[in-house]
Amino acid sequence: MTNMDKLYEAVEARGPVCVGLDTDFSYLPEDFVDSTLSRGENIVRFNKKLIDATKAVAGCYKVQIAYYESLGLEGMKAYADTLKAVREVGVPVIADIKRGDIAKTAEMYAMGHFTGDFESDFVTLAPYMGLDSISPYLPYAEKQGKGMFVLCRTSNGGAKDFEYEKLADGRHVYDLVGDKLNALGKDYMGEHGYSSIGLVIGGTHIEEATEIRAKYRDSFFLIPGYGAQGGKAEDIAQYLTKGNGGVVNSSRGILLAYKKQPGTAFDEAAYNECVNMKEAIAHACSLL
């Protein structure tokens, strides 16, 4: 069974919410911070409480490495400890690293994030140097069932600068990327009909959503953009297949939910936000 199979089953069991642990130190409630500990240690305490509170309603977690790199060595220890904390509760974890290099460098990235202190179940990758920026990760998919989510049509406004450009044959650049990755992924299919090579498909741009889902039916989607970036449940539902086939990420919306729920502890507020998000997406899917 591949990690993508396990993610599919996690979504079946708990829903498609992907909790983004993009944890900036400034997000921590002032009364939670222990002044005797480092920023990294406080972030790990925060993350662990949030993981424990949301693990029953989270399909997976996504840990954005930049928030940890910015703190230097203590941050990288916090990153490793956070990945470990997620893996210990048995929920799939995505390392949001967006690597995009080639050859030996990519081999080292793959080794660094699929083994050792920073081991994760999935990584995010940038494809624009070509398929040789993806291939060094594939042995880990073949031998260990590891998975990857490759940027295809992203949720940021600047996506239209490159991804939406038209090719001579009428396709967009994101179509070309998706087509090539979809073809490559057919050699790495799992038991539930999804490839180990997933796609990052932003939930803020809904143009041709139904066509994208139909065209890449073998590809599991990582769908950013919900909540703080403006993505709505009724739009995002179009990228799912009967409520599965993708995970929907929310980071700030969950991490900072306590600010919209006065008097509620941050971990309880995060749980409430996950439940609300899960129910909203399920309702939207039921209307399709």
Regions found by a protein language model. Give the residues of each.
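Conserved anion-binding
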Residues: 97, 101-198
